[in-house]
UniProtKB/Swiss-Prot annotation:
Modified residues (N-acetylthreonine): 2
Chain sites annotated for binding chlorophyll a ChlzD2: 117
Cofactor: binding details: The D1/D2 heterodimer binds P680, chlorophylls that are the primary electron donor of PSII, and subsequent electron acceptors. It shares a non-heme iron and each subunit binds pheophytin, quinone, additional chlorophylls, carotenoids and lipids. There is also a Cl(-1) ion associated with D1 and D2, which is required for oxygen evolution. The PSII complex binds additional chlorophylls, carotenoids and specific lipids.
Protein name, as recorded: Photosystem II D2 protein
Residues the record lists as binding chlorophyll a PD2: 197
Gene: psbD
Function: Photosystem II (PSII) is a light-driven water:plastoquinone oxidoreductase that uses light energy to abstract electrons from H(2)O, generating O(2) and a proton gradient subsequently used for ATP formation. It consists of a core antenna complex that captures photons, and an electron transfer chain that converts photonic excitation into a charge separation. The D1/D2 (PsbA/PsbD) reaction center heterodimer binds P680, the primary electron donor of PSII as well as several subsequent electron acceptors. D2 is needed for assembly of a stable PSII complex.
Binding positions for pheophytin a per the UniProt entry: 129, 142
Gene Ontology molecular function: chlorophyll binding; electron transporter, transferring electrons within the cyclic electron transport pathway of photosynthesis activity; iron ion binding; oxygen evolving activity
Length: 352
């Protein structure tokens, strides 16, 4: 009789089986992060398409905001709940809608649905980048970079209205609706004169400049890209080896500016640092606005302009413009308040 001696196969638990299935190499990687990403992204996008197609904002804003009512892609939106709803999460089964889907849509329940599921979807996408980076053994800088737009989304759509009286003051999900919100930010918070906004603009525009310069420099310093006279005809996307000269690029920018990046790591870290830091600063600024912190105030100029009708600066002109925005938006944007302003409080002066 023959006796085989060997290790018995260990019994695999449910976690190991699920882990193998989730992290299997397939066309679309799922992963553990996919359990959060895919359902929430699907529901957020589905809620947005449903709202912009069918749901009116007549009951919350007195507006038409759906394709069904004649709006187009630029003017359709999923609008914020009514101001009377405060910070209620507006669950379909909650005391406001009481399980009535039509009533839930009328109250603005789709906005909280899209905002919360969208936030978790963005977080799931960042976790997906962490998970895949760990699987292929690279650094997680993509995920860290993606935290910047997440911080902006969360600060604008969630933290800002939490600091105000209700979800009503958050942006609605639509193109024209976002533009209205920008006007609101300027009129009520003087956002363009906020140093955190300035850092955000510098980050975004600086990143665009760096991206354009970097792409042009790489194209300019190609030394091996095929036999054709035209770069685009000669470029071979399957070519494995590097085809541009960092030394030549360094020499070029040293002649242009007198300084240049000495290595690729510092160059690309700088391209990462500029936009990400700018967006983080913008998010911090919006958190400040949630607490109604003010931007720069040049009170001495305002006092002098009030005393001397001939004295005016671009700052005092902008202050008058902000007063005009507030006077218009308070009545137009919050009709439920039934605000009526006497002529004495409306802005006047040669700025308008």
């Amino acid at each position: 009789m023959t006796i085989a001696i060997g290790k018995t196969q260990e019994k695999r638990g449910l976690f190991d089986v699920v882990d193998d299935w989730l992290r299997r190499d397939r066309f679309v990687f799922v992963g553990w992060s996919g359990l959060l990403l895919f359902p929430t992204a699907y529901l957020a996008l589905g809620g947005w398409f449903t709202g912009t197609t069918f749901v009116t904002s007549w009951y919350t804003h007195g507006l038409a905001t759906s394709y069904l009512e004649g709006c187009n892609f630029l003017t359709a939106a999923v609008s914020t709940p009514a101001n009377s709803m405060g910070h209620s999460l507006l669950f379909l089964w909650g005391p406001e809608a009481q399980g009535d889907f039509t009533r839930w849509c009328q109250l603005g329940g789709l906005w909280t649905f899209v905002a919360l599921h969208g936030s978790f979807a963005l977080i799931g996408f960042m976790l997906r980048q962490f998970e895949i980076a760990r699987s292929v053994k690279i650094r997680p800088y993509n995920a860290i970079a993606f935290s910047a737009p997440i911080s902006v989304f969360v600060s604008v759509f969630l933290i800002y209205p939490l600091g105000q009286s209700g979800w009503f003051f958050a942006p609605s999900f639509g193109v024209a609706a976002i533009f209205r919100f920008i006007l609101f930010f300027q009129g009520f918070h003087n956002w363009t004169l906020n140093p955190f906004h300035m850092m955000g603009v510098a980050g975004v525009l600086g990143a665009a400049l760096l991206c354009a310069i970097h792409g042009a420099t790489v194209e300019n310093t190609l030394f091996e890209d095929g036999d054709g006279a035209n770069t685009f005809r000669a470029f071979n996307p399957t070519q494995a080896e590097e085809t541009y000269s960092m030394v030549t690029a360094n020499r070029f920018w040293s002649q242009i500016f007198g300084v240049a990046f000495s290595n690729k790591r510092w160059l690309h870290f700088f391209m990462l640092f500029v936009p990400v830091t700018g967006l983080w600063m913008s998010a911090i600024g919006v958190v400040g606005l949630a607490l109604n912190l003010r931007a720069y105030d040049f009170v001495s100029q305002e006092i002098r302009a009030a005393e001397d009708p001939e004295f005016e600066t671009f700052y005092t002109k902008n202050i008058l413009l902000n007063e005009g925005i507030r006077a218009w938006m308070a009545a137009q944007d919050q009709p439920h308040e039934k605000l009526v302003f006497p002529e004495e409080v409306l802005p006047r002066g040669n700025a308008l």
